[in-house]
Swiss-Prot record:
Membrane topology: Multi-pass membrane protein
GO cellular component labels: plasma membrane
TM region(s), chain numbering: 4-24, 30-50, 63-83, 88-108
UniProt entry tagged with the keyword Nucleotidyltransferase: no
Organism: Erwinia tasmaniensis (strain DSM 17950 / CFBP 7177 / CIP 109463 / NCPPB 4357 / Et1/99)
Entry similarity comment: Belongs to the UPF0299 family.
InterPro entries: LrgA/CidA, Uncharacterised_UPF0299
UniProt xrefs under NCBIfam families: PRK01821.1
HAMAP family xref list: UPF0299
Protein name: UPF0299 membrane protein ETA_12980
Superkingdom, natural source: Bacteria
Pfam family, any one: LrgA
Keyword terms: Cell inner membrane, Cell membrane, Membrane, Transmembrane, Transmembrane helix
Localization annotation: Cell inner membrane
């Protein structure tokens, strides 16, 4: 029984910390003059707390593992909700596909250029020609 209560405590603590970061992100989003989603700010805050070792990973790991395990299931209601707007999506199909393709190409090209620059810098450092 004690082990069961310990596991329940770990999950409750993990979800509470994640929830606190989300609501802290909502507060920060309200204060900022630019529109950044509160959930993104909450994840950024959680990342900063974990990276700075202010928040132990063990406190959020059980809840995060559970959410990641069932992530696909969490997208089902959103996907069903999109079906209600199929007429709008079909009318805007071409712009959606074009923007996705162009965005993908931009990301691929940017990633390739950054990787090449990093590889060139690394090669120069190995040769002793550091900038």
């Amino acid at each position: 029984m004690r082990s069961f209560l310990h596991v329940i405590w770990q999950y409750l603590r993990a979800f509470f910390v994640i929830w606190l970061c989300l609501y802290a992100g909502r507060g920060v989003a309200w204060l900022l003059p630019i529109a950044i989603p509160a959930s993104i700010l909450g994840m950024l805050l959680l990342f900063i707390l974990l990276s700075a070792n202010i928040l132990p990973l063990a406190w959020v790991k059980p809840g995060c593992n559970l959410l990641i395990r069932y992530m696909a299931l969490l997208f089902v209601p959103i996907s069903v909700g999109i079906m209600d707007h199929m007429d709008i999506l079909s009318a805007q199909f071409a712009p959606i596909v074009i923007s996705c393709a162009v965005g993908t190409l931009i990301v691929l090209m940017t990633t390739g250029m950054v990787a090449q620059r990093m590889d060139n810098r690394h090669s120069r450092r190995l040769e002793g020609k550091d900038e």
